[in-house]
Amino acid sequence: MPELSRRRALGAAAALAAAAGTQAVAAPAATAAGHHPGPSTAATGHHPGTPASFDEVYKGRRIQGRPAAGGHHQHHGGGYAVLIDGVELHVMQNADGSWISVVSHYDPVPTPRAAARAAVDELQGARLLPFPAN
């Protein structure tokens, strides 16, 4: 039996980590692929898995979220619009499915609703100003 060296131990650990990472990525992708039985993206105009609409008052601020109609280039959130007191909060969905906003872009959250709540927390009562469009 060959002697166990540091090089062999690190090589084996790297191989195990790569195998575990591949399996961890492949399993959710396989589950998600067969998990959207509904109308196609072309039929609805929205991406599968688009978050549900919401309209609530959070800490005295009205936050709303809904699929954006026709916002292909303006909305990087996969066609989803978030409003705080009627002013649009620019949101974007990351490749991993998390969401960020222009107010709290270093703190990814799981949903647009959570992004709106995080923005309200960060604003601390200040008014949200419209994001300038170029």
UniProtKB/Swiss-Prot annotation:
Organism: Streptomyces glaucescens
Post-translational note: Predicted to be exported by the Tat system. The position of the signal peptide cleavage has not been experimentally proven.
Its biological purpose: This protein may function to deliver copper to tyrosinase.
Chain spans, region Disordered: 27-76
An annotated GO BP: melanin biosynthetic process
Keyword set includes Signal: yes
Sequence similarity: Belongs to the melC1 family.
Annotated S-S bridges: none
One family name in Pfam for this protein: MelC1
Protein name per its UniProtKB record: Tyrosinase cofactor
Coiled-coil segments: none
Signal peptide: 1-32
InterPro entries: GriE/MELC1_sf (IPR023199), MelC1 (IPR010928), TAT_signal (IPR006311)
Molecular-function annotations in GO: copper ion binding
Gene3D superfamilies xref list: protein ne1242 domain like
Domain of life: Bacteria
Keywords assigned: Copper, Melanin biosynthesis, Signal
